[in-house]
Amino acid sequence: MLSPLIRRYTWNSTWLYYIRIFIALCGTTALPWWLGDVKLTIPLTLGMVAAALTDLDDRLAGRLRNLIITLICFFIASASVELLFPWPWLFALGLTLSTSGFILLGGLGQRYATIAFGALLIAIYTMLGTSLYDHWYQQPLLLLAGAVWYNLLTLTGHLLFPLRPLQDNLARSYEQLAHYLELKSRLFDPDIEDESQAPLYDLALANGQLMATLNQTKVSLLTRLRGDRGQRGTRRTLHYYFVAQDIHERASSSHIQYQTLRDYFRHSDVMFRFQRLMSMQAQACTQLARCILLRTPYQHDPRFERVFTHIDAALERMRASGASLELLNTLGFLLTNLRAIDAQLATIESEQAQAMPRNESENQLADDSLHGFSDIWLRLSRNFTPESALFRHAVRMSLVLCIGYALIQITGMRHGYWILLTSLFVCQPNYNATRHRLALRIIGTLVGVAIGLPILWFVPSLEGQLVLLVITGVLFFAFRNVQYAHATMFITLLVLLCFNLLGEGFEVALPRVGDTLIGCAIAWAAVSFIWPDWRFRNLPRVLQRATDANCRYLDAILEQYHQGRDNRLAYRIARRDAHNRDAELASVVSNMSSEPDVTAETREAAFRLLCLNHTFTSYISALGAHREKLSNPDVLGLLDDAVCYVDDALHHQPEDEQRVHQALEGLKQRVQSLETRPDSKEPLVVQQIGLLIALLPEIGRLQRQISPPISTLITQP
């Protein structure tokens, strides 16, 4: 009993992270106390906080490279503030250029975006403490010392648990997969009637979250594969990742319109049986995620075999009672798909399953990292236009920080640089995220000040305040990604305690509230009036990218029905791109729900388009999940023509409407009249073609409703 408990907490990354933060804060507070110079606590702690906020997962060589880049950026940002601080005009110019430059650097990838944010944070932390030291280099070096201290702890943790972040990402992937399967199971609820589109909307949003987690896992895998491709631990996680991708394709598959199933089988238990089976598979994915975290073997639930047996019996009973043969065949395809998911889960721990595929292409991952200066320039140049969200964010942040700095210079506020700090954290690249953070930041600050003042009064001792500083710092990082208001409250307490070490705790408390309100107001004005997102939303272009990706996915599947099934890199890229574009569309439509200047008609059309696109992708996924080489030339010919028709129907000009309609009618007749072998995958292929082309007229109508002509889209930058 003791061993599992110890394992649970020893291998719990969250607790290990909290311990690392605790040790780091103990170091930044205990050393100054031991030296008798508590003023050192402020730059050391702030440097450590900035380093923790920019912590990046990578292999050892990558972490060392990230550390060097981070320290260089931190020193440049901090030293620039110290050197330019006496000259306001030069300082404002430097603030503008550095802010826009650092943010645009994020166009090179998430690593550089994170480091750039940390550099801006260090710059503002330096502004808060410019009066602490006489020489310009003292505070920058102390801030760097705090950053180095935290990174030393991080490197130590990496040496002890090198694969831990990768396993965390992999476990989160299976948790998100479980969530997706659970939501998918709700589509089999026979009591859904009027709100039949709501579960599809939730499913599309969940798919976006799952794809984001899978993409993050892929990045973690790539960093490890560059250095230790042959190691068993990395090979094992790579196998788990490929299984997650395959389960996702099967889980996202749709074999019929769910409303048709619900209407026909409303008073039968078969819908509940399928719902329970998918719910059990969701629980199995959750259990697998837990096993990955605890590094214990996954044991597949033996009850699955009984569940499959009972579903087979239920389908046979319905077949004997004269139920629709077409619908029963569809349920049979669905059951085959769910059996394949079960087989993946049941054999995931098998040594044979974890062996490398013979085809090297099936073991490769798409590498999206930088490749040479031409690639660097290409990625940067893409963001030199207002069409880029990153460019708009860079311009907004530059103006926000300059306005805040100008306000400080005009009013002479002593601690006014908290305005800049608030704006940096609150002002996000899009309107919805900024609005959400704005309210939480204000609430957290008000509560933090209300709690902080009595604490400063009742805990006057230096040692007591240092202990509280450590506690509030740990709690800030604990709540940072789950409860932003709580995190703001604790960071407010930390700041009050830091300045109280200089005897200024009571003096800065109320100004902190005012600065927060001003910083939030500036951030809100920026996202509302400086190139607001809804003017650049361009739903037609996002939809165009989604339909293009679906067409490429269909092409990749078509190739495998001709040549045979495999998991080559090109196929997996096409599949991932289709789901990523579906996730992008879900994000845009979700943001539209709370943006101003969106008519109810546009919002409803966008919502319906999202549901249709996700359904369309799920029909394609079903073709992909069941892909195998076919020999019937009539079925292959129909599939070839259907793929060409889908591409044509989604990209045609208005004057071609009649031709496209005639082609649709011709395909429908071929689908209805084609003879197929019932003991093969041919009926499923024909069925999925029918489902795909049935959606195209409504998709086309909604496309025309929200889109300019195709020629306009092509000429736009």
Model-inferred region functions:
Residues 1-19, 26, 30, 34, ...:
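Long, hydrophobic alpha-helical segments that serve as membrane-spanning/inserting helices
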Residues 1-120, 125-161, 332-490, 498-517, ...:
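Alpha-helical transmembrane segments and their membrane-interface boundaries
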Residues 95-99, 242-250, 616:
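Elongated alpha-helical scaffolds
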